[in-house]
Regions:
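Oxyanion-binding and handling regions
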Residues: 2-4, 8-57, 68-71, 106-145
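Generic alpha-helical propensity signal that fires on short helical segments
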Residues: 43, 50, 58-61, 86, ...
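Noncatalytic linker/hinge segments flanking ATPase motor cores
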Residues: 62, 84, 115-119
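Stable alpha-helical structural segments in soluble proteins, enriched in small hydrophobic residues
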Residues: 62-66, 93-95, 99-101, 120-129
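N-terminal glycine/serine-rich phosphate-binding loop of ATP-dependent small-molecule kinases
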Residues: 62-77
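DPxDG-like acidic metal-binding loop motif
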Residues: 75-80, 85-106
Length: 145
């Protein structure tokens, strides 16, 4: 195949920008983080039933505040530790809806998945999911009896 220099330049200029969204509703506060190529942003909200019901609005408002839309997100990482079943159920429903409607891959992780890792930060989650081969688009619930 022969490419002219202008065609090659066009190919080289096209880059896939990966924007990632981390969601954690298992703690005292709802935590959201956006990881872009250049920046990391995060917010927290009170962990209440009303905020669970408004989670889609909270996510969209957070994205809008950073000049992003849900279509700009390439992957979602969601904590599925068994601490807040209502929060996990609501957030998983929203994430699955994003997956079905926008084809956004999601990864359900638990901090227990990252054995022998210390001082884990939320911005490390995407790389740790890759390292520990967390499967995409699979919900693997953790049950405590």
């Amino acid at each position: 195949m022969i490419l002219f220099s202008s065609a090659l330049e066009t190919i080289l200029e096209y880059k896939i920008i990966m924007n990632k969204l981390v969601i954690d509703v298992t703690n005292e506060k709802i935590f959201l983080m956006i990881i872009t190529k250049d920046d990391i942003y995060n917010i927290t909200k009170e962990n209440t039933k009303i905020n669970y019901e408004k989670l889609t609005i909270i996510i969209n408002d957070f994205l809008s505040s950073k000049n992003l839309k849900i279509v700009d997100i390439n992957a979602i990482y969601i904590n599925n530790e068994a601490r807040s079943f209502a929060g996990i159920r609501n957030s998983l429903s929203i994430v699955k809806a994003f997956n079905v409607s926008r084809k956004i891959d999601y990864y359900c992780y638990s901090f227990n998945d990252f054995k022998d890792q210390k001082d884990i930060k939320y911005e490390d989650i995407p790389n740790l999911c890759d390292k520990f081969k967390i499967k995409k688009n699979l919900i693997n619930p953790i049950y405590i009896s």
